[in-house]
Design a protein with these regions (language model features):
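Juxtamembrane membrane-water interface segments immediately C-terminal to a transmembrane helix
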Residues: 36-69, 75, 79-83, 87
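Intrinsically disordered, low-complexity polar/acidic regions
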Residues: 46-54, 79-290
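Intrinsically disordered, low-complexity segments enriched in polar/charged residues with Gly/Pro
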Residues: 7, 11, 19-20, 35, ...
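Intrinsic-disorder/low-complexity regions
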Residues: 2-3, 265
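Extreme N-terminal signal-anchor transmembrane helix of membrane signaling/transducer proteins, especially
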Residues: 3-5, 9-39
Length: 290
C-alpha cells in the first residue's frame, strides 16, 4: 500500500529537512566523485609527464653516446694509418653520412698539436697541401697550438673554421685538457661555434676525443700529456641536435636545457618552444644529462 505525498507535505519542517539532507548527501557525493576524477587524471598526467621526461633524458644520453663512439672510431683511424691526409678524412666522414645518421653534428674534424716553435713551418706545410690561405687564429704567441686541420663536410660554413686554435679559448681548453688527461671524450660547455653566421646563430658545444702517438691510450697521465698528437672533435648546433629528439619523444612538453645546475638565462642552451616558456608550470622536473 502506497501513500502519495504532496509537495505541501514535503515542505513541512520534518519532511523538508529529510529532503534537503538527501540533496546535500547527493551533492557531497558528486563533489567527491568529481574531485577524485580530477586527482586521478592529474596523477595519470603527472605519471605520463615523468615517463616522457625520463625517456627524453635517456634518448639524449644515448644520442651523445653514439656520437662519442663515432669520435672513438675517428681517433682509431690515426692509429691504423701512418699518415691521414685530407682526402682520407673526407672519404671517411662521407662514409659516415652524418646528415642522415647523426643529426645535429655540424662537422667532424681534427686539430693537430703544434709546438710554439713549429707553428710557422706547420702553416707552410698545410698551405702546400691545398689550403693557400691557411692561418692559425687567433694570432699570438703560445706554448702550443691546436689549430683545426680537417673539418668535414667541407661546407662554406665549416671552411671558415680552418686554422682556428680552440685551445686558446678557456671554454675549449678545459674540455681539451680533460680529454687529454683522461683519454675519454669530453664536452665543452655552451659556446658559439666559430662557423656560425650572424643571422642564423644558435648555441653550440663541441665534443673532443684525444689522439695519441701509438696504437693505444697511454696508462700514465704524464705519458698521455707528452704523447698527445691532437684531437678529433664534433661540433654541434644545439637546436639542430635537440629538435629531432624532443619532437619524437615529447612534442607537447616545453623543454629547457641549461649549461648550469642553476636555471639562468645566460646558461640557456635550448628551449623547445621559447614563445610559450614561462615560469608557471603544471608539472616540473629537472634532470642532469651525463
Amino acid at each position: 500500500m502506497t501513500k502519495d505525498v504532496t509537495l505541501g507535505q514535503l515542505l513541512r519542517p520534518r519532511q523538508s529537512r529529510i529532503a534537503w539532507l538527501v540533496l546535500l548527501i547527493a551533492l557531497v557525493l558528486t563533489v567527491i566523485a568529481w574531485r577524485f576524477s580530477i586527482i586521478l587524471v592529474a596523477d595519470r598526467t603527472e605519471a605520463h609527464f615523468k615517463t616522457q621526461s625520463l625517456q627524453l633524458k635517456t634518448a639524449i644520453e644515448e644520442r651523445l653516446l653514439n656520437y662519442e663512439q663515432v669520435l672513438a672510431g675517428s681517433a682509431g683511424l690515426f692509429a691504423v694509418a701512418d699518415l691521414v691526409g685530407r682526402d682520407d678524412w673526407r672519404l671517411y666522414v662521407n662514409k659516415l653520412d652524418i646528415n642522415r645518421y647523426y643529426p645535429g653534428i655540424q662537422g667532424i674534424g681534427y686539430t693537430a698539436r703544434v709546438e710554439g716553435d713549429d707553428v710557422v713551418s706547420f702553416v707552410k706545410r698545410i698551405r702546400e697541401q691545398g689550403l693557400p690561405d691557411y692561418l692559425v687564429n687567433p694570432a699570438g704567441i703560445r706554448a702550443e697550438y691546436h689549430p683545426i686541420v680537417f673539418l668535414e663536410p667541407s661546407t662554406q660554413r665549416n671552411r671558415r673554421a680552418y686554422g682556428y686554435d680552440a685551445f686558446g679559448d678557456p671554454a675549449h681548453r678545459i674540455a681539451m685538457e680533460a680529454a687529454r688527461d683522461t683519454g675519454e671524450a669530453t664536452m665543452t660547455g655552451k659556446v658559439v661555434l666559430v662557423q656560425e653566421e650572424v643571422d642564423d646563430e644558435q648555441a653550440g658545444f663541441l665534443m673532443y676525443f684525444p689522439v695519441y702517438e701509438g696504437d693505444s691510450v697511454p696508462q700514465i697521465m704524464a705519458e698521455r700529456r707528452s704523447r698527445l698528437r691532437g684531437f678529433v672533435f664534433s661540433a654541434f648546433r644545439v637546436n639542430n641536435l635537440m629538435d629531432g629528439i624532443v619532437g619524437l619523444i615529447s612534442p607537447f612538453l616545453d623543454v629547457r636545457i641549461y649549461d648550469s645546475d642553476v636555471a639562468i638565462k645566460d646558461a640557456l642552451m635550448y628551449g623547445s618552444n621559447l614563445g610559450s616558456l614561462d615560469d608557471d608550470y603544471t608539472f616540473e622536473m629537472s634532470q642532469k644529462v651525463t
